[in-house]
């Protein structure tokens, strides 16, 4: 398994990781909460490592080697009783690349050394139908995918209500996706405010859970 994060979550890094996957058959996952991810039509898609320990263990089940580039080897966020803290399977060898090495240059060089193809699968342009009926987490996700503007910045602190959003927006016009800082909550509103100040020419969408919003309403 190739686990990526950080600077690899933009176009060049995503393409390089997809090229390596095409050449070797390695499974590519990304960290649970990427700082900034470029997503949408025309870009390679990558599955996130699940937040819940038992689901993350299922994703990593059977892995003999875990190559970690520009992120950290995955551990649980909390010491839940009877739950694993280290998420990779017993016997899996973890290879963590030095963070001082440029991760994009590294993966591009690896792809070239492997003779990896230049063309890789990317998300097709596609939007869900604009929904009707009751307001649910699923219909909110469909509406977001149907209406998302080009070059939007999405701040995602939807938490448990956001399960349907990644699938509904995968083929939307290209956008940036900003996530939480690890297991902490409360960053969504100030992060969206900062994004709007930094990028006044882009539309910013803040997907905010009600409990998380209570921490930073002053933003």
Language-model regions, residue ranges each:
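Conserved beta-strand elements of the Class I
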Residues: 1, 64-67, 153-155, 205
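Glycine-rich, anion-gripping cofactor-binding loops and their flanking helix/strand elements
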Residues: 4-96, 172-202, 214-218
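Electropositive phosphate-/nucleotide-binding environments in soluble metabolic enzymes
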Residues: 10-14, 50, 54-57, 100-104, ...
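Alpha-helical scaffold segments in soluble metabolic enzymes
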Residues: 16-19, 55-58, 62, 105-113, ...
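Generic secondary-structure signature for well-ordered alpha-helical cores
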Residues: 22-26, 65-68, 112-119, 146-153, ...
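Terminal amphipathic helices with adjacent charged low-complexity linkers/tails
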Residues: 81-119
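Active-site diphosphate/adenylate-binding microenvironment
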Residues: 121-201
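Active-site beta->alpha N-cap acidic-glycine motif
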Residues: 209-211
């Amino acid at each position: 398994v190739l686990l990526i994060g950080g600077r690899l979550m933009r176009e060049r890094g995503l393409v390089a990781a997809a090229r390596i996957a095409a050449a070797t058959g390695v499974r590519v996952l990304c960290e649970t909460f990427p700082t900034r991810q470029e997503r949408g039509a025309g870009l390679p898609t990558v599955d996130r490592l699940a937040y819940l320990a038992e689901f993350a263990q299922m994703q990593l089940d059977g892995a003999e080697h875990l190559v970690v580039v520009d992120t950290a080897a995955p551990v649980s966020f909390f010491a839940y009783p009877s739950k694993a803290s280290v998420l990779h399977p017993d016997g899996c060898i973890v290879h963590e690349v030095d963070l001082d090495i440029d991760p994009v240059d590294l993966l591009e060089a690896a792809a070239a050394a492997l003779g990896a193809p230049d063309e890789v699968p990317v998300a097709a342009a596609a939007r869900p139908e604009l929904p009707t009926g009751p307001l649910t987490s699923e219909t909110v996700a469909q509406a977001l995918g149907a209406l998302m503007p080009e070059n939007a910045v999405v701040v995602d602190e939807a938490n448990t209500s956001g399960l349907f959003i990644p699938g509904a927006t995968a083929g939307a016009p290209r956008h940036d996706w900003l996530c939480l800082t690890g297991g902490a909550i409360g960053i969504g509103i100030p992060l969206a405010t900062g994004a709007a100040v930094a990028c006044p020419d882009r539309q910013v969408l803040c997907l905010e859970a009600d409990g998380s919003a209570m921490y930073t309403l002053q933003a």
